Regions:
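Sec/Tat-exported extracytoplasmic proteins
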Residues: 22, 29, 50, 198, ...
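Acidic/His- and Gly-rich active-site-bordering loop/insert found
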Residues: 3-147, 161, 172-173
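Divalent metal-coordination and catalytic microenvironments
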Residues: 25, 46, 103, 115, ...
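Histidine/acidic-residue-rich, glycine-tolerant segments that coordinate divalent metal ions
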Residues: 67, 99-101, 122-124, 130-147, ...
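Metal-dependent amide/peptide-bond hydrolase catalytic core
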Residues: 258-436
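Short Gly/Pro-enriched turn/cap motifs at secondary-structure boundaries
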Residues: 90-94, 185, 225-229, 372-376
Length: 436
């Protein structure tokens, strides 16, 4: 039996275990920076397999994290994670939202290959009707308001499957494997903190993936790459003014409503960029306490996007100038908190070709006709990919194809779990091709 056949056989034999692990992660869904139970279990399993394991502040640079919840909420989640069966040795490292995990396998001289598996859930209420398979079969989320509605329970499980297979063939590998289990992908808040801690420095190959829906009759199991992911920046903006009686002494006040209104109108008037697509959106505004009170505080949530990192930077700089100027114009002040960010991405041609060749010729898995899939949203794996490519390395973000129930980010989302062993085969086959 050659190594590719070993990879396929082992992946298929662990299908039941992969399904069980995915369902466990699904049942105990934890969103970004709350993945304390999830991370502790991943760290335990990697340790038992024999990996060198990094946790806590070894993984994420604390000050580079974005959109981190309050200390009070983090402590509440920590207590829940412990109560729900978090590993007692490793959960302590997740305190304060330090929920990344990296497993390292050193196999002598050779290239360094990193793989990213995101692990966070979403703030979604999962469907309880028996028509929803997780509800029917007893693994829907017990954490009300949190749900794996984007497949990251599957991604984390795939990473653990990859870890097991690669450890079993380590004698055939030359180089270093890094398995990066990333928190807080939703809201593009987590990847930069891992890059800023140096974990992509010196990496020669970077591979990420996402489960993606396919047509019912499509036999393909993978699209080798992605392009078109929009660079993005997200801010929470707080305007501060001065309250006053709206009828008796309005001139005494400093009305944040005027500052917010001026900012919104001018944000949507930012000139478009000739270099490509740009986006701006004001998603929420919360302000005011009564009809006869000059509002003294307002919160606004905004985002800008660009087809390239440069266009996004143009949009961001324009937006910051507008917001600060609108506040000043009406005698108010403002503070802006960065809540998430991502760069644009494009998969390396050579690595996409390698994925296609390995799948078709060695693993005998059908590949989609298109080499690369357009990603209309934003993905912070871009920070990792760009860092590797800037160093002269190769990176790709694959689409691992499956049949999905319900649209992504919906309360009825689910995946066909056959995608789990399929993805393990693809990752391990490509890594072996690079490192043997």
């Amino acid at each position: 039996m050659n190594i590719y056949d070993r990879i396929k056989t082992m992946s298929d034999e662990m299908a039941g275990d992969l399904t069980a692990q995915r369902r466990d992660f699904h049942k105990y869904a934890e969103p970004g920076w709350f993945e304390m139970r999830t991370s502790s279990i991943i760290a335990r399993k990697l340790t038992e397999l024999g990996y060198e394991v990094l946790v806590g502040d070894q993984v994420c640079k604390k000050d580079s994290r974005m959109g981190v919840p309050s200390e009070e909420k983090l402590e509440e989640q920590y207590e829940r994670a412990v109560a729900q069966g978090a590993d007692p040795e490793f959960v302590k490292y997740t305190k304060g939202g330090m929920t990344g995990v990296i497993g390292i396998l050193r196999c002598g001289e050779g290239p360094t290959v990193a793989m990213r598996f995101d692990i966070d859930a979403l703030g979604v209420f999962e469907e309880h009707d028996p028509s929803h398979r997780p509800a029917k079969e007893g693994f829907n989320s017990v954490n009300e308001g949190f749900m794996h509605a984007c497949g990251h329970d599957g991604h984390a499980t795939i990473g653990l499957g990859v870890a097991k297979v690669l450890m079993s063939i380590k004698d055939q590998l030359h180089g270093t494997v890094k398995l990066i289990f990333q928190p807080a992908e939703e809201g593009v808040r987590g990847a930069k903190s891992i890059v800023d801690n140096g974990h992509l420095d010196g990496v020669d190959y970077m591979i990420g993936s996402h489960v993606t829906n396919k047509k019912e009759d499509d036999p393909a199991v993978v699209i080798p790459g992605s392009y078109g992911s929009l660079a993005m920046t997200k801010y929470d903006v707080i305007f501060h003014g001065k309250s006053a009686h709206a009828g008796g002494s309005p001139e005494v006040g400093r009305n944040v409503m005027l500052a917010v209104g001026t900012a919104i109108l001018n944000l949507y008037a930012i000139p478009r960029h000739s270099g490509g697509v740009s986006r701006v959106n004001v998603g929420t505004v919360v302000a005011g306490s009564g009809r006869n009170v000059i509002a003294d505080e307002a919160k606004m949530e905004i985002e800008v996007r660009g087809e390239t990192t440069e266009i996004n930077e143009y949009m961001k700089n324009y937006a910051v100038n507008i917001i600060e100027s609108a506040a000043k114009m009406h005698g108010c002040t403002c503070e802006m908190k960065l809540m998430g960010a991502a760069n644009s991405l494009a998969s390396s041609e050579a690595l996409m070709e390698r994925v296609k060749r390995v799948c078709e010729e060695d693993l005998h898995l059908p590949v989609a006709k298109e080499m690369s899939s357009k990603n209309g949203g934003s993905e912070d794996v871009s920070y990792m990919m760009n860092r590797v490519q800037e160093q002269g390395g190769q990176a790709t973000f694959m689409r691992v194809l499956t049949h999905e129930a319900g649209p992504g980010h919906s309360r009825i989302f689910d995946i066909d779990e056959q995608v789990l062993p399929n993805a393990v085969k693809i990752f391990c086959g490509v890594v072996y091709d690079i490192m043997h």
